[in-house]
Amino acid sequence: MLSIDITDRQIKLVRGVHSGNKIRVQDADMRELTLGMVSNGYITDVPMVAAELNDIIKTKGITEKDAIVSITSSSIVYKEMLLPKPKSLKNTAAIEAMIQANMGVSKEFNISFTIAGETEDEEKNKLIKIIATACPQRLVDGYVRLFSHIGLSLKGVNIANNSVTRLIINTPKMADRMPMLLIQIDKGFLNMNLYEDNQIVFSRYFNIDPSDYDNAPDYVIRALSDNLFRMIQFIKSRKGAKPLKEIMFYGDTGNFIELSNAISSFNVPVHVLAAPSTVIS
């Protein structure tokens, strides 16, 4: 199986196989993309992106045809909500209909969700806690065209935020680190997710660009400092807010020391999110 992550600036491809209850990574590669080929997660130049992806596949001698893709875009809407508990939690159509009505999005959006728990209202009516994601269909359609162009079979579309949230809430030790801010670092964006009580309670996506920081080589670090300051002010303003216990990075964290030094004034412990134990190389 191939796992492909495409952002506005990069293609990342990982080739892995299931071995028992683990995933063994057999190969990985990355390519830089010319600006404009992908815009805010949308594939704007399918032939050019296909050529780059196909070159990776041919160079690595990859023969697998099944693939999943991870999508990140500010046009993807995230929302936490409480909904009446249906008679059967397997009735996903009913849950998706309630989510669609709650979020006020059209049928042109793909709805996905995670059930984060159950509760009751003041009248003892049973409710479910939902973390919902609405992804524009035309965003997905671009990846369908891309994979068709190079003969890959698209087996799944993962919203990056959902994937990492499932990892966080299914890792028991993570609950002890909350409230925790998880930050995805990328050359083109920052994605900040706040977790409390073993669930995601807020998510914010920031587009970043070198031109906003005089094309400085350390523009990502500057953008992190600026946006984290605003995020922490927002967190403090929330009713009943608790101080952060930890900040965790994932993504492009090769310059972790510089990243952590840039936010040391916030006096919150900083670490890199470790790969799950089920993934081996």
Question: Model-found features: residue ranges?
Answer:
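Hydrophobic/aromatic-enriched cytosolic interaction surfaces used to assemble or bind macromolecules
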Residues: 1-281
